[in-house]
Amino acid sequence: MKLILTADVDNLGAPGDTVEVKDGYGRNYLLPRGLAIVATRGAEKQVEGIRRAQEARAVRGLDHAKELKDAIEGLESISLTVKTAGDSGKLFGSVTAADVAAAIKAAGGPVVDKRSLELPKAHIKATGKHAIVVNLHPDVVAKFHLNVVGA
């Protein structure tokens, strides 16, 4: 069965790749979960849309990555205000990579893809300063501190 991947699938490919898989794997796993579509002429247009979206998110090379790094590290302070549970410093919920990306943009920084952010743990669940790493390019990494403040 010939399919076009719409999401990243381990050991198979990336979005937009055309792959040949066994019929059962395609019908019972990939198609029901929305990880792939059947390869048709109309699907080629969807592949182009997927590729354009990937290119828009991708950093445009080493020079552009260095510019983004300078912009992120040049920000005075990046802070995020969230609801807390009393005076203990614990948060209602948690701070995710999407929240951090929005905080960077709100502080006057560039738009950063949430998948390029590395949080200290999967989510930040306490107030205070937290070290955040942004993987902009295989050779360029930006580091900054996020100040999480309780509301």
From Swiss-Prot:
Gene3D superfamilies in the cross-refs: Ribosomal protein L9, C-terminal domain (3.10.430.100), Ribosomal protein L9, N-terminal domain (3.40.5.10)
SUPFAM superfamilies for the chain: L9 N-domain-like (SSF55658), Ribosomal protein L9 C-domain (SSF55653)
Disulfide bond in keyword set: no
Keywords recorded for this protein, A-Z: Ribonucleoprotein, Ribosomal protein, RNA-binding, rRNA-binding
Any one Gene Ontology cellular component term annotated for this protein: ribosome
GO function term, MF aspect, one: structural constituent of ribosome
GO biological process annotation, one example: translation
Species this chain originates from: Rhodococcus opacus (strain B4)
Domain of life: Bacteria
UniProt xrefs under InterPro entries: Ribosomal_bL9, Ribosomal_bL9/RNase_H1_N, Ribosomal_bL9_bac/chp, Ribosomal_bL9_C, Ribosomal_bL9_C_sf, Ribosomal_bL9_N, Ribosomal_bL9_N_sf
Disulfide bonds: none
Family: Belongs to the bacterial ribosomal protein bL9 family.
Function: Binds to the 23S rRNA.
Protein name: Large ribosomal subunit protein bL9
Alphabetical list of HAMAP family matching this protein: Ribosomal_bL9 (MF_00503)
The keyword Mitochondrion appears for this protein: no
